């Protein structure tokens, strides 16, 4: 299933990631010159521009450097360009993919330049959400059939007289315009511009206890700060989203995957084995994401704090 985008470093780049959404510019040219280098104890990881993906890389980088003795370079790359970079050996691993069947067919099955690195252990899901305080006041708003009833309350200056459905970046893969059209809803999709901008807007609405309807996804640390309730869309069935123009169903629940450059997977030694074994829970990821995004720790500091408290989890990845 195509999810977050059609395309979820160092501490300095980590800070940049918090300010950008899933539509950050293609940075493949920043790829490490050591990526896929024979015999080099250097690993280059792709970082997507949302905090959950940053949490994965932060912990993997910390353990690779402090427990296995590797140097780790990280590169910010949009999701689809990341597949190209991975195939070319510009990066060695991608730790959180939300589903790109076209790229999987091309690079994994046909060209065999990329291999599946196993499940991350986290299940991703996109949906429409309203704040829980609004859902408690109006329980029927959680059924899409009743959304038009509340369109006037969800109208904003940007939505042109219709209710507002807030999305993130225009570069995200989203079915929302088709859903609004095919479900004949009196709503306008309005893009915040990035994940960070969307979070800022959600927090502002919540501070003022205003109603809002937003495209959002799990896992995401913000749920702990702003409780939200999902709106039930028509049930997802396999293939219901095959034609982007005709989508009229909910988004699926997708086990997130890791992918490795094929040569790296074969010759990457302990680093490749470690990345294949890296597997944690939604709770683990959210714990690190909160440390980075809410408590403002650097990615390395957040990773160290998690590593110090979860040895029984990560020790198995080093075998």
For each predicted feature, which ranges?
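A conserved helix-loop-strand patch within extracytoplasmic ligand-binding domains
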Residues: 113-165
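Short, well-ordered beta-strand elements
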Residues: 38-52, 70-75, 162-166, 275
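Short, polar/charged alpha-helical segment
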Residues: 51-70, 180
């Amino acid at each position: 299933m195509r999810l977050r985008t059609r395309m979820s470093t160092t501490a300095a780049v980590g800070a940049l990631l918090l300010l950008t959404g899933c539509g950050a510019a293609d940075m493949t040219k920043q790829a490490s010159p050591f990526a896929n280098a024979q015999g080099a104890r250097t690993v280059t990881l792709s970082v997507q521009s949302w905090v959950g993906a940053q949490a994965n890389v932060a912990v993997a980088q910390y353990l690779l450097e402090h427990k296995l003795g590797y140097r780790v370079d990280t590169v910010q790359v949009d999701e689809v360009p990341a597949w190209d970079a991975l195939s070319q050996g510009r990066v060695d691993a991608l730790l959180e993919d939300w589903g790109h069947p076209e790229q999987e067919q091309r690079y994994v099955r046909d060209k065999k330049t990329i291999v599946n690195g196993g499940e991350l252990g986290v299940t991703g899901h996109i949906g429409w959400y309203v704040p829980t305080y609004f859902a408690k006041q109006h329980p029927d708003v959680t059924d899409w059939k009743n959304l038009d009833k509340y369109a006037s309350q969800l109208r904003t200056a940007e939505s042109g007289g219709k209710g507002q459905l807030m999305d993130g970046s225009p570069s995200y893969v989203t079915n929302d315009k088709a859903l609004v059209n095919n479900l004949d809803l009196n709503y306008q999709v309005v893009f915040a511009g990035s994940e960070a901008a969307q979070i800022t807007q959600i927090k502002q609405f919540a501070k003022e206890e205003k109603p809002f309807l937003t495209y959002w996804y799990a896992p995401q640390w913000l749920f702990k700060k702003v409780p939200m309730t999902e709106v039930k869309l028509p049930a997802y069935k396999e293939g219901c989203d095959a034609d982007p123009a005709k989508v009229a169903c909910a988004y699926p629940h997708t086990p997130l995957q890791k992918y490795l450059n094929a040569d790296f997977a074969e010759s990457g030694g302990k680093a490749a084995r470690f990345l294949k074994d890296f597997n944690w829970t939604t709770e683990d990821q959210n714990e690190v994401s909160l440390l980075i995004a809410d408590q403002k720790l650097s990615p390395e500091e957040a990773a160290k704090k998690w590593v110090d408290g979860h040895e029984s989890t990560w020790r198995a990845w080093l075998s």
